Amino acid sequence: MKAHTGKDWFWYQMGPQERSKARDLIHFSHWPQCEKWFENNHHVNFLRVDTTETENEAVFGSIVYDQGLGEEKDHTVFHFYITRQYFFTINFDFSILREIKGKEVVRQMERADNAIEGFLILLGELMNAYLIGVDEFEVKLRKLRWQIKDDNSKSILNRVHLLRHELMIWKNLILSAKKIEMALKETFLPQNEGKKDYQRTQLKIDRGFTYISEFEGELNNLLHSEEVITSHRGNEIVKALTIFTTLFTPITALGALWGMNFSVMPELNWKYGYLFSLLLIVTSTVLIYLYLRKKGWTGDMLQERKKKKKPRKRRTL
């Protein structure tokens, strides 16, 4: 167990094997509500507040603070218990967070006035790691945006779905941070609402949700565009098959007549029977094609220019 000291408050950072020490830190008045949560170490995204006694409030729970993209079970949970004088965490590991230096965060936390503000700094650093991940997601989205311009294959549609899945994971992680921030505000604020660290954490969470909302809208637009293109291609295939079947109706009908074995077949003695039949097939096929073309049933539903526009040169001052 690591004990970090602030201004009249403490943070006890514990490993998963130190639950017995954490049990001793839970106030006896909070234990009736904490017992079910504490005894079950398999809780995921559990959050409760205890405001029964004034000046002795507490927020406790468990959240997933790291989630892999491949498997649902590939996640890391940390547990926390927060009061006005101290808080403890179980299984919180700075090394999991992207580009976050634990020692610098601890030094920043030690300057906090109370335990609530200290935990808000920790929550803010958690959001910093999430925002870094969201920035990396934006790079992937930008690449996909330009790939769709030149390639509308099935693999692109699959990539859109994969990015939507990744975005949902980031959204859920940020939502967990938002839930804790709201619980702290409900339990201990407004005394910390004007503090800069609380405001910074709140703004980071709002920034994360703004990014997520914008990316969701763009992915939905990309998915809708891909669905329209897929539907159009399906319609083109059905239309082509229909036209193909219609154009070959004359030769099919004539072939069916030739296949009949009636006793009287006058065309057997015609000198130019084959020539006449071929002319009849070609003429009827052309007439049917001209009729379909006149109705506009053979043209593309979406006219595509084969010639690509040359990119405009940027003007330089």
UniProtKB/Swiss-Prot annotation:
Membrane topology according to the record: Multi-pass membrane protein
Major site of localization recorded for this protein: membrane
Compartmental location: Cell membrane
Domain of life: Bacteria
Coiled-coil regions listed in the entry: none
Induction cue: By secretion stress.
Entry's Gene Ontology cellular component terms: plasma membrane
Catalytic activity: Mg(2+)(in) = Mg(2+)(out)
Sites annotated Important for closing the ion permeation pathway in the closed state: 241
Motif (Probable selectivity filter): 259-261
Site (Essential for ion permeation): 235
UniProt family annotation: Belongs to the CorA metal ion transporter (MIT) (TC 1.A.35) family.
Protein name per UniProt: Magnesium transport protein CorA
Annotated organism of origin: Bacillus subtilis (strain 168)
